[in-house]
Amino acid sequence: MSSRPLESPPPYRPDEFKPNHYAPSNDIYGGEMHVRPMLSQPAYSFYPEDEILHFYKWTSPPGVIRILSMLIIVMCIAIFTCVASTLAWDRGYGTSLLGGSIGYPYGGSGFGSYGSGYGYSYGYGYGYGGYTDPRAAKGFMLAMAAFCFIAALVIFVTSVIRSEMSRTRRYYLSVIIVSAILGIMVFIATIVYIMGVNPTAQSSGSLYGSQIYALCNQFYTPAATGLYVDQYLYHYCVVDPQEAIAIVLGFMIIVAFALIIFFAVKTRRKMDRYDKSNILWDKEHIYDEQPPNVEEWVKNVSAGTQDVPSPPSDYVERVDSPMAYSSNGKVNDKRFYPESSYKSTPVPEVVQELPLTSPVDDFRQPRYSSSGNFETPSKRAPAKGRAAKSKRTEQDHYETDYTTGGESCDELEEDWIREYPPITSDQQRQLYKRNFDTGLQEYKSLQSELDEINKELSRLDKELDDYREESEEYMAAADEYNRLKQVKGSADYKSKKNHCKQLKSKLSHIKKMVGDYDRQKT
């Protein structure tokens, strides 16, 4: 008995099947056997159609983008508040500080008259000598905060209201481009803002370096108390706490835009790899609540079927437990379910008299007939025709190809143990090795056939988004898409898929037996 828990068989991982684990002992072939390295499986070998991406969750990549955009909105408001609170101290200087006829109102310094000798400094941006105007730097910072606020608000609103535009790859490409541009501009604005609010940081490279340093040096060295301090000059030379907070928030916005780019790229890659039917943009509530009045319904049904012979005691267990049925719909040969226990007593009347509109149908459970076979609700492929593409039904979000007993419990493991018991000799190991190679080739051939259908469906799904719905290209692609969906829903496809999973379980068991034998020898 294997120690593996009762669950689905492990996914086939090519890197685990290394040839050196299955090579024969050196004492048989003298160490001269060379095995060709095994190539990796195709990208769709892990059944991507079985995986569902829950993009409505806040922890998913689109959800993280929503969170980051919300944080950018808050940080932009904080930057606007911090920068705007320091604008009042800029009215005492500006263009007249380093060039103009008025001069800075710092009594007796003569700094304004000195600046007038060098000519007029530009009031917006940069003047002579590479000097950065604080008002221009703050205006640049406020403008970028406003642009980032608008962009983040658009991203947040379009994703929260779950618009169709926000569910396309083109939308996330736009998010990447806008985030990259705004991130670069915010970085430039933050650097310019640092130079504007900290004049000593730019004084070394400007013509007014010595004058700026002489004016601001008094605030950087300890001075006697009681002296008059000009508040305008103080706020010009010293970085205020609000300005420091704005600088930090500016760099945090840059990091937030970088993270948005990362998760937008991740979202586009997932949308390219998986089919649209595998992505859930809205939360579904199918199995959250139990159907109403189930007990009352059961009582009514029981009252109407009193003269029907009672089924055997283990019949309910066999119906309720999917482990009692194999993939072809027949009962497995499990020891505690012999054929005589359920073929001797007819029970189909109970099932046939149930109303078709019963609440149990909402569960989409298999319906069993008298022969022991079961019927599963048919899945409708999403129609892609001349009209707009219909949305995927709620039931199609969930895999209706149930994993039955032959695939999910340890019955199949017991079958493999009976067919491939633990290895006791090198000759038996070689036999297992040959069976493994044969099964592996069959698995790879069968898997590649299934992969071609999945990849072709994914390619056609992307093409349908690019074509105009009434064009000939769209109609041709839609016909091919619907044909492949019918092929994928056929019994032959499901049979091959189940056989592929059984081969995967067989290869995993053989690998375990060989590994156990090699560990015992060592």
UniProtKB/Swiss-Prot annotation:
Q: From start to end residue, where is composition biased (Basic residues)?
A: 381-390
Instruction: Give the compositionally biased regions (Polar residues).
Output: 367-376
Membrane topology, from the record: Multi-pass membrane protein
Q: Where are the transmembrane segments?
A: 67-87, 141-161, 175-195, 245-265
User: In this entry, which stretches build a coiled coil?
Assistant: 432-488
Please give the residue positions where the record annotates the modification Phosphothreonine.
305, 403-404
Instruction: Outline which residue ranges sit on the Cytoplasmic face.
Output: 1-66, 162-174, 266-522
Q: Which Gene3D superfamilies match?
A: 6.10.140.340
Q: Which GO terms describe its cellular component?
A: apical plasma membrane; bicellular tight junction; cytoplasmic vesicle
GO biological process terms, alphabetically, are: bicellular tight junction assembly
Locate the compositionally biased regions of type Basic and acidic residues. Answer: 391-400
Q: Name where it's found.
A: Cell membrane; Cell junction, Tight junction
Ranges for domain OCEL: 414-522
Q: Which residues carry this modification: Phosphotyrosine?
A: 368, 398, 402
Any Pfam family: MARVEL
What disulfide bonds does the UniProt entry report for this chain?
216-237
PTM characteristics = Dephosphorylated by PTPRJ.
Residue segments, region Disordered: 1-20, 356-407
Instruction: List modified residues, type Phosphoserine.
Output: 302, 313, 321, 340, 369-370, 408, 490
Reported function: May play a role in the formation and regulation of the tight junction (TJ) paracellular permeability barrier.
What's the record's remark on domains? The C-terminal is cytoplasmic and is important for interaction with ZO-1. Sufficient for the tight junction localization. Involved in the regulation of the permeability barrier function of the tight junction.
Assembly and partners are described as: Interacts with TJP1/ZO1. Interacts with VAPA. Interacts with CLDN1, CLDN6, CLDN9, CLDN11, CLDN12 and CLDN17. Interacts with PLSCR1. Interacts with LSR, ILDR1 and ILDR2. Interacts with TJP2/ZO2.
Q: What is this protein called?
A: Occludin
Q: Which organism is it from?
A: Pongo abelii
- State which gene encodes it: OCLN
